[in-house]
Design a protein with these regions (language model features):
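Sec-dependent N-terminal signal peptides
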Residues: 4-16
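Processing junctions and N-termini across compartments
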Residues: 13, 31-32, 114
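Short N-proximal segments of mature Sec-exported proteins
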Residues: 26-81
C-alpha cells in the first residue's frame, strides 16, 4: 500500500509545470483526507480498547491503517514543503475536532463511525480514485 501511495504521488509530481496549482490543490486536500482518517483510526482503536469489545486482530488492523494514514500525511506534507510542526498541528486539530463531533464521549462514536468508516477504508484501498476526485474538483 505504501508503494501505491508513493507511486501516485510520483505520478502527480511528473506532470507539467503548468499543473503546479493543481498539484498543490490535490496534495493539500489529499493530505487533509489522510489526516482525517488518521484521527478516525486512532479514535476507533481507542474506543474499541476502552469497550473491551475488539480482538487483537481488529486492533492491529486499525493500528496499521492509522500508521499508513500518518505516513501519508507526512509524505505529502514534505512534498508540499510543510514543516513537521505544521503537520503535527494539523493532525492534532483534526483529532480534537473529531472528538468534539462525538461530544468527547465514546457512547456517541457511531456518528463518527457513520461519517468516516467507509470513506477512510476507500481512501486507503483506492487512493488513486481519491486523487482523481481532487483533480476533477480542481477543474
Amino acid at each position: 500500500m505504501k508503494k501505491l501511495i508513493s507511486a501516485i504521488i510520483l505520478s502527480i509530481l511528473s506532470t507539467s509545470a503548468n499543473a503546479d496549482d493543481q498539484q498543490t490543490f490535490v496534495f493539500n486536500n489529499l493530505q487533509g483526507d489522510f489526516t482525517t482518517c488518521y484521527s478516525y483510526y486512532l479514535l476507533s482503536e481507542e474506543g474499541l480498547k476502552k469497550s473491551g469489545s475488539a480482538n487483537d486482530e481488529t486492533i492491529a488492523g486499525l493500528n496499521k491503517s492509522a500508521d499508513l494514514s500518518l505516513e501519508s500525511v507526512f509524505m505529502i506534507g514534505q512534498q508540499l514543503g510543510m514543516n513537521t510542526d505544521t503537520m503535527r498541528n494539523r493532525v492534532k486539530t483534526s483529532f480534537e475536532s473529531m472528538k468534539k463531533e462525538m461530544g468527547e464521549d465514546f457512547k456517541n462514536f457511531s456518528s463518527v463511525l457513520d461519517k468516516y468508516a467507509i470513506f477512510c477504508k476507500y481512501l486507503i484501498e483506492k487512493t488513486d480514485d481519491r486523487v482523481l476526485f481532487w483533480e476533477d474538483k480542481f477543474k
